[in-house]
Amino acid sequence: MTPATERDDTDTDVVIVGAGPVGLTLANILGLQGVRTMIVEERATLIDYPRGVGLDDEALRTFQAIGLVDKVLPHTVPNQILRFFDGNRRLLAEMAPPDARFGWPKRNGFVQPMVDAELHAGLARFPHVEVRWGHRMAECEETADGVTVRLDGDPTPVRARYLVGCDGGRSATRRLMGVSFDGTTSPTRWLVVDIANDPLGHPNSEVGADPARPYASISIAHGIRRFEFMIHADETDEQAEDPAFIHRMLGLLVPHPERVEVIRHRVYTHHSRIAGAFRKGRMFLAGDAAHLMPVWQGQGYNSGIRDAANLGWKLAAVVDGRAGDALLDTYDVERRKHARAMIDLSTMVGRVISPTNRHVAAVRDKLIRGASVVPTLKRYVLEMRFKPMPRYEQGAVFHPEAPSPTSPAGTLFIQPRVDSRDAQNVLLDEVLGTGFAVLCWNNNPRALLGADLFDRWKALGARFVAARPLTQLHWTGHDDPDVTVIGDRTGALKGWFDAHAESVLFLRPDRCIAGACIAQRAPEVSTALFGVLHLTQGGGNGHHGADRPVLHVAQSATEPSGTVAGTP
């Protein structure tokens, strides 16, 4: 059955269960690719209170790719510093990562309801994307070529090719799939209180590793501050939610707790869990439905956005006929290992922060202070080098031999600012577009690949980019109408290629390096990639590249970048 025929036999291509940030991001990715998408959400509207409070550089890069980063940025606090204090309020450690190698700051406070609202508003660009509010998925039956979804209160089933459960930790999709959710739930409880008209007012965040009562104080944006306090074992949930108790907790950090304006408060526990499979047949899990982690690294929200970025382009390629269904198996292969690493890191940091035994806390403090006098260890913490970065050894990547720790294939490519002949000081992804890209240093991709392979990538909607020193930008000796020439404005591209032997990169739509090689090996690596990416010979049925309803919304070339998106 051809993809076009399958599209005629279904009501939509992809059903997404859940209109949270992961489902909304995935719907925007699919919408940009011309994929018919339906979100079903049992709530009547978006959740209007904050849950996540931190965005990282990878999430902002994804929002850039879907053309919404300019809408999101006003609701963020970029380059947010996080400080850790001991029980005597002496500084233990500080996280202030200075670089923006992926185009955006590594740490950003944000107001989740406002960002989610922008993600939802972005769907209005796509007539082929629909959100059904107030509809709960009752059941989902898989058939040979799709899924049939039944919604409560609607007698007409929805037929789709694939279903993605983005429906949270209590995922109905996961239960219907019969997938386990292994892990642990911490016995420790926390009181979270969100405050309007920030009573402290400073722009950064802190964690108090006080054995008497660990706490967190987080600046979000728009005058909102979040406080979190550990609840002792002898304190009940009812006590913790009593206004007098809340005022007593706030009084530890605020001079007049009775004057604060509480947005909401609740008691919660930390979960460290991961689904037994992210894919089963034509059904997938993403976000909290696939994994839950403690809040200490602020990676729950960001890990879900990574899921959407990884799965979205693969679904679009398969639905459009540009790739075979086997490409979708790489979603689980690639995302599971990294999600597990994030869970383990977040769990470990929580254990470091929250011991209530004073002797254990004292030993911890001495170890951290001892490490801080070693420059390499201090930079390791300051620059957040401990954060696990995706490095795919298997999946939709090609390694000609066993990957080494320095192999670029399977890693996320940098995003410096560059000049083209049409624009100056733009982020690299604005030139690369939102599909596949072939990027080489100081060479012509057509000459390296040969006509047949070049045309095959072109049929898949790939962009071809030749990076040069800025001094060579306007030299026209090797001009090619299908190749965009960029000038290395900051020297970051030359620095990257100088540090690696590879000079030709094949970039996936999520900007992961699918394959890399020296110039002479470009044809053989290209051919191998068509295999591991399960790409089709014909190039699909025309919904990629310039035929998409919206490719991207370019960011302003004059945007100040020193504090937000890298130094020009």
Swiss-Prot record:
Signal peptide: none annotated. It comes from the Bacteria. Keywords: Aromatic hydrocarbons catabolism, FAD, Flavoprotein, NAD, Oxidoreductase. It holds the Pfam family FAD_binding_3. Its EC number is 1.14.13.127. FAD binds at residues 13-42, 278-288. Pathway: Aromatic compound metabolism; 3-phenylpropanoate degradation. Gene3D superfamilies: 3.30.70.2450, FAD/NAD(P)-binding domain (3.50.50.60). Its cofactor is FAD. GO terms for biological process: 3-(3-hydroxy)phenylpropionate catabolic process; 3-phenylpropionate catabolic process. It catalyses: 3-(3-hydroxyphenyl)propanoate + NADH + O2 + H(+) = 3-(2,3-dihydroxyphenyl)propanoate + NAD(+) + H2O; (2E)-3-(3-hydroxyphenyl)prop-2-enoate + NADH + O2 + H(+) = (2E)-3-(2,3-dihydroxyphenyl)prop-2-enoate + NAD(+) + H2O. GO terms for molecular function: 3-(3-hydroxyphenyl)propionate hydroxylase activity; FAD binding. Belongs to the PheA/TfdB FAD monooxygenase family. Catalyzes the insertion of one atom of molecular oxygen into position 2 of the phenyl ring of 3-(3-hydroxyphenyl)propionate (3-HPP) and hydroxycinnamic acid (3HCI). This is 3-(3-hydroxy-phenyl)propionate/3-hydroxycinnamic acid hydroxylase. It comes from Mycobacterium sp. (strain JLS).
